[in-house]
Amino acid sequence: MAPKKAAKGDEAPKEVVSLGPTVREGEHVFGVAHIFASFNDTFVHVTDLSGRETISRVTGGMKVKADRDESSPYAAMLAAQDVAQKCKELGITALHIKLRATGGNRTKTPGPGAQSALRALARAGMKIGRIEDVTPIPTDSTRRKGGRRGRRL
């Protein structure tokens, strides 16, 4: 049997529920965008200021079908737009950026998606606070791959 429908006059008033923190007008709510740009993929991961609570995480590989396009600037832009939209829904209006390359004993240069992900966040209306490079730099590392004579082309 189908559930009974309520009469027109019996509806309770709907409450407005705010998901984000309560702030004054014109005040920015900050989050932290961790952008990890390697040459194989780009991660755009937004957390709260402590870094414990994930708000949204989207990768370039989630946005494009071809494996070769995962690290492309276009995929990074789409990922950043998705993240910015989710942040706005939750009331986050500004982001501190932590940019990271692969690092360690591998390349310390961010991949092709880093620049476009940052630009897409700014163009989506998010205010940018501090930009910091958090690529891991070894003080003395394990031996790098490639052998004694290096990679021969």
UniProtKB/Swiss-Prot annotation:
Record-level GO BP terms: translation
Q: Which family does it belong to?
A: Belongs to the universal ribosomal protein uS11 family.
- Is Glycosyltransferase one of the keywords? no
| Protein's UniProt name | Small ribosomal subunit protein uS11
Listed A to Z, the keywords are: Ribonucleoprotein, Ribosomal protein
User: One MF term from GO for this chain?
Assistant: structural constituent of ribosome
Q: Report if keyword DNA-binding is assigned.
A: no
Which InterPro entries does the record associate with it? Answer: Ribosomal_uS11, Ribosomal_uS11_CS, Ribosomal_uS11_sf
Q: What domain of life does the native source organism fall in?
A: Eukaryota
For this protein, the record's Pfam families field holds: Ribosomal_S11
Q: Which HAMAP family match?
A: Ribosomal_uS11 (MF_01310)
GO cellular component labels: ribonucleoprotein complex; ribosome
